[in-house]
Amino acid sequence: MGKYNLILSEYLSFVYNSQSAVQIPIYYSSNSELEKRCIDFHAKCVDNSKKGLSLSSLFEEYKDVIDNATLLSILSYSYDKYNAVERKLINYAKGKPLEADLTANELDYENNKITSELFKSAEEYTDSLMDPAILTSISSNLNAVMFWLERHSNDVGDANKVYRRRLDLFIIVASTINKYGVPRHNEKYRYEYEVMKDKPYYLVTWANSAIEMLMSVFSHEDYLIAKELIILSYSNRSTLAKLVSSPMSILVALIDINGTFITNEELELEFSDKYVKAIVPDQTFNELQEMIDNMKKAGLVDIPRMIQEWLVDCSLEKFTLMSKIYSWSFHVGFRKQKMIDAALDQLKTEYTEDVDNEMYNEYTMLIRDEIVKMLEVPVKHDDHLLRDSELAGLLSMSSASNGESRQLKFGRKTIFSTKKNMHVMDDIAHGRYTPGVIPPVNVDRPIPLGRRDVPGRRTRIIFILPYEYNSAQHAVVEKMLSYAKHTREYAEFYSQSNQLLSYGDVTRFLSSNSMVLYTDVSQWDSSQHNTQPFRKGIIMGLDMLANMTNDPKVVQTLNLYKQTQINLMDSYVQIPDGNVIKKIQYGAVASGEKQTKAANSIANLALIKTVLSRIANKYSFITKIIRVDGDDNYAVLQFNTDVTKQMVQEVSNDVRYIYSRMNAKVKALVSTVGIEIAKRYIAGGKIFFRAGINLLNNEKRGQSTQWDQAAILYSNYIVNKLRGFDTDREFILTKIIQMTSVAITGSLRLFPSERVLTTNSTFKVFDSEDFIIEYGTTDDEVYIQRAFMSLSSQKSGIADEIASSQTFKNYVSKLSDQLLVSKNAIVSKGIAVTEKAKLNSYAPVYLEKRRAQISALLTMLQKPVSFKSNKITINDILRDIKPFFVTTEAKLPIQYRKFMPTLPDNVQYVIQCIGSRTYQIEDSGSKSSISKLISKYSVYKPSIEELYKVISLREQEIQLYLVSLGVPPVDAGTYVGSRIYSQDKYKILESYVYNLLSINYGCYQLFDFNSPDLEKLIRIPFKGKIPAVTFILHLYAKLEIINYAIKNKSWISLFCNYPKSEMIKLWKKMWNITALRSPYTSANFFQD
């Protein structure tokens, strides 16, 4: 077994190093003889440890177990309640503790003062500004670092340099923490006033960030960057990340393009050897110099020096260092402000009368026209989604907060909850549900607020609107998004594209006679000036649309939507400030509506069009592309002469002047070679992503457990690694060890082994090899997977009670009755299951399920139940296939150039050999005809799991299913009798398998699975017509080859002679695959 188990046993002897500590390994085997020996071994170990005898004689006696069985878990027993962290920390606390500069930040509470100075008493105290919001403690983090340092203290050569760099940085952290003592966390991993009062307020979150940074140090440059950020972030809790990352927006404009990739007509990336010179006016250098000076003023030395040294020749080779600095800057942690400051931020901008009303007018009209263009077709055709918008809204109702806690009665049970879905049920039950009335959000009913914290930016507020707003906007927004899906201007929504496609779009039109204008409009989106023109544009669009239809239901839908806009033009918010709740008139647009993303994109598109139309009065150019992506927009302009410094300068000044005429405080830049937006940046013709995901601090607390968070931690580590920020893998594994251990009693803990955490089961947390998803096919792996499946679904008494109440049942049947033309058990059950699943976000239900899961897990980790599950998983399919494959060595030349310099070597190598992919593989079934047929007549959206179930039913049943959803019997009959139906069977199976194999996640999303270079390595003689079997054989072969290449940086070729007799068996099995949901899959989903 791999490295994990080795680290696990070393870690246990590191943490529990007293005389009394015992570690008992627990083994299991699928071989019944060996399994008996495993049980004996365990019994004797426990027996010996009770008597205080050594276990080493048993290890000899049961050598067969240790050699041939699989480690299941380690039981660790230790009574000294250890203040071991403090004891070990003293050895590292050799340096001078950091002293915070208490004037570093504008807002008093952002200075790292002693907690009792910021909060006079426990009543006043809040941890919300420094809460790491992660289910692991500062003491565990310190332990993990000290464990690593101890393990590597004897390293030699380059490894020793890494050790010395990290040791040096850890001495800073250790000395500072040791001065005040290690803060102890409570059982919810929070730090209370009593613990913090004599310590600096930001000590914990700073130390977590510092540890995350120092464990990501490898080179000398890393060391310099980390040291500077660790020391300065101790004092500067507000602007450090912004200062350090600001220069990037200019740096991307300084590198000549010498060869790049462009998007061709087929939407594929294709190499182009064009050369484009970076044309940079002096003013740009002055602005950059100013940024560097600001960095120096803030006390930075090495980072600005590195940037200045790079500026000498602006080479692409050394740009990776700039890229590194940009990524590192985010790891100083989140900037968490008080809500009152976050809200007032938008309201501080003075309102001036001196604006260009003509431009505002044009802006509003563009928004109006875009709204009309988006909705014209569905409105004129009286689209069923717009007619049944209320039902669609209910089906998609989220289980997020509705802004207030209410007392609700479900049967005999009375509960308090803030969840939207529960409020809706309650309102319907008591006749309070009035979808035709959108409650006002004025001074009488101010909006409660949520928050969004991001490193390097101010805290933003989020409206928590009543559920009526969600209901009213849902259907219309869906239609807006489906329009955006096939409109290239909307980079974020454009059909199945990914970031690589957007990259090729930009580079495609760059040349000596074009320039690219890129603007960050995040300030504008939340500014007061935007509110009136924005909402009015939408209202005018809706008015025009209402005249295009005679269907009262569609008109009603549009009117409700319009009402949400009218209400929000007069919005008040409630902000807790100390003990009082302030009501403030809030005249700006905030996130929180269903339309936020779509409407912002529309507004940003209108904004850049307005600006371009002004520029066009002065210059003659062709707009080659306009794109909007979230808070950013960019456009490539082609002139009829070569671009000069003078031109870049003038266009830049004109653009900024035009924005200022609208009072838009935005960052507008003009370049000839690259852009930088929030999601990605293009420099020297290559694409880069910011690797800025924090590992040891989280933005907010959700209801995920330690296991979930361990999986999220691993997933974040992988994303950062793909983007060029590499954290020590041993450290990540140590964190996983800590976060997945299960306490049995105070002194007894159970630590799962690698097999448990990496097997594709409901408990999977990480992959034993980065970037490679393995599906275990050995006897022991399948055995443990089956064992886990026996305890996968946990019941919750509270959820059952709610679900059996009249309130709940009535709600579900109301939905079913509105949705279905005739009875349909699959859909009715589906709705009930979905609604019941929404109850999971209600804490008591969640906790109850978790407790059951953990007690089952505890039983399982001490002895796996031999269990014959009749469920088939993807592992079983792959296990059936595997024996028929023969492997031979093969050669594949490197033939593509690099376009994403930050990728790890092995992933880069695979892309260079087989090519990359610019599209998402469809894994939801939405491209199948049955899915399109259903969405033509119904607002119901079946999941890929449901489609997979339905499509394998008998034809008669499929027909009934369709008819019950409102598909005319004629259409349903035609569908089942046509060839389309058998194509669908294959399409849906394909999507389902892709979905199970997470083909759009991790690094698999970068590889071209249909690469001819890859196909060349696979030989499968064609037998009979079972496309599904051919598909799975090919896909398995591709994954095997790619996984091998990632691991070994070399290629294999696969030959498969699959017997015809087995094909039918396999095909039958393929219609019974069970999907497994695990912390690992939800972490992947969470990345989305």
From Swiss-Prot:
Catalytic EC class: transferase
Gene3D superfamilies, sorted: 1.10.357.80, 1.20.120.1390, 3.30.230.140, 3.30.70.2480, Viral RNA-directed RNA polymerase, 4-helical domain (1.10.10.1990)
Domain of life: Viruses
EC number(s) on file: 2.7.7.48
GO process annotations (BP): DNA-templated transcription; viral genome replication
Subcellular location as annotated: Virion
Molecular function GO labels: nucleotide binding; RNA binding; RNA-directed RNA polymerase activity
Co-factor(s): Mg(2+)
Subunit structure: Interacts with VP3 (Potential). Interacts with VP2; this interaction activates VP1. Interacts with NSP5; this interaction is probably necessary for the formation of functional virus factories. Interacts with NSP2; this interaction is weak.
Functional summary from the UniProt entry: RNA-directed RNA polymerase that is involved in both transcription and genome replication. Together with VP3 capping enzyme, forms an enzyme complex positioned near the channels situated at each of the five-fold vertices of the core. Following infection, the outermost layer of the virus is lost, leaving a double-layered particle (DLP) made up of the core and VP6 shell. VP1 then catalyzes the transcription of fully conservative plus-strand genomic RNAs that are extruded through the DLP's channels into the cytoplasm where they function as mRNAs for translation of viral proteins.
Record protein name field: RNA-directed RNA polymerase
Native species: Rotavirus A (strain RVA/Pig/Mexico/YM/1983/G11P9[7]) (RV-A)
